[in-house]
Amino acid sequence: AAPARPWLFPLVCLVLLGLGLCGTLLHLGQPLRFVNGMANPASGISQESYWVIALGIVIVVDLVLSWRGKTVRAVRWVGGAVAVGFMVVTGLAYFDCLGLVAWRGAATLPVFILGDVALGAGLCAVLAKADDWAASLLCPATVAAQAAWGVAIVAFGLYLQRSGLDATALLA
């Protein structure tokens, strides 16, 4: 049976993507820094922006198709691939940030990717129908992704401790 509201997942994804973009502006301290960052196409923020635009387009296509009662699995697979690219580029943007030595550890990329996978699996589990065949796989997948993210966080913490870095300023 088809989901009652197939458009709900892409709508929630689009809203969360929009909130993330607003968070980026606040994260930079001054929203105009975003414009300055975009002046350099090779900068991390520019690379993230290109992937966000591509992801947003795929999500809008998925939303329109779902709204019309059609779901195209290929669109969701493309969206997943673009989302993985976005996660990798975001992790690399932090890893390559010369001003923050704390992000230069090997655990940075897994922290970003596994954290996003854990959140995405959780969102899928929340929005899945109880009788959906995938729903039985989502709960263990969510727990596994969260456990893997926890291991990555511990590895990141050990890297910080071993390097003598204080990351408490990153919490603000």
Residue ranges and their predicted role:
Residues 2-58:
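Membrane helical hairpin/interfacial module
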